[in-house]
Amino acid sequence: MNEIKKAALHTVEENASFFTSISDAIWDEPELSLKEFKAAALYTDALEKLGFTVQKNLCGIETAFSGSYGSGHPVIGILGEFDALSGLSQESGVAVPQSVTPGGNGHGCGHNMLGAGSLAAAAAVKEYLAASGKPGTVIFFGCPGEEGGAAKAYMAREGLWYGLDAALTWHPSDTNEVSTGTNNSCIQVLYKFHGIAAHAAGDPHNGRSALDAVELMNIGVQFLREHMTDDCRIHYAITDAGGVSPNVVQA
């Protein structure tokens, strides 16, 4: 390994506590998709401190941003994520389920590390470009809303990936490997059911249960699974079951 590459790697080692502190801070303040305001501010501040030119509010998304360094080709994009999941609050350093806030947000698959690791990689490439004097551009893309928000799709639609020679990312896992592959596309659909409320004991025949309709649709979807190809997935959440009183027809 030549001295320039050693210097680039030394940048990561020298600033390890800095990158780790970002990961820890995002773990401690888990924010849901497209609401990662503290995380976005943390990253844009870090990018500016590291000498990147920062752009905020990409594609009109408040928590999407980029930090670039260098000029010319190759142009290397490095993608970072940082959103959390609802209901997965977890104490750090504990190997058993132990929430900080019961029912609160948490990082179920390491997005606190994902963004910080990508930032470290971008900093290493920046150091290599600066030390070698070679042409090239590195761009760190802050990609919010990975857990269902699909911000990358909007960023692609707006042409943010045009001009890149390569785009790289990583994901925390139990193995250390380099891999390529594809992922399923994702479509989100929100269904709303409306019924007619009625007293379930005294006037049930005049009620129209929206909850019954939800359950019938869900059962139909379960039967549909048998006839779908192996690469398809269906997931669901009932966000409003209509009410909490069993003696009322849920509307």
Show the residue positions of the predicted features.
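Histidine/acidic-residue-rich, glycine-tolerant segments that coordinate divalent metal ions
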Residues: 63, 85-87, 93-106, 112-113, ...
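Acidic/His- and Gly-rich active-site-bordering loop/insert found
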Residues: 2-107, 112, 116-136
